[in-house]
Amino acid sequence: MSIAITRTDDLLTVTLEGELNILSAPELERALADELETVDSVVFDLTEVSYITSAGLRVLLATQQAVQERGSVIVRGACDEILEIFEMTGFDTILVIE
């Protein structure tokens, strides 16, 4: 998995490429750890993500919980398969899906 993080003021943009699974989720957690306390919202660009497992969903949920008092988590560019997973798990009601 490739992870690119950019910050603009209080907005963190996380661009991912590959599969967000049990192997890559801890790497993403480590990459986000220092940033989440100082941003209001996080945008996940999933345009190049081909698959997400429960471990990946857990990272998205933990991110939402970390910023919910100040802002939100926005997901952009998710493919139909990932959108279906969000709908089946109720994540489409927790996250902002664009």
Across the structure, where does each feature detected by a protein language model lie?
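STAS-typified acidic loop motif
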Residues: 2-29, 47-48
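Short acidic-hydrophobic, aromatic-tinged amphipathic segments that line or gate anion-handling sites
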Residues: 96-98
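Amphipathic alpha-helical interaction surfaces in cytosolic regulatory modules
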Residues: 22-94
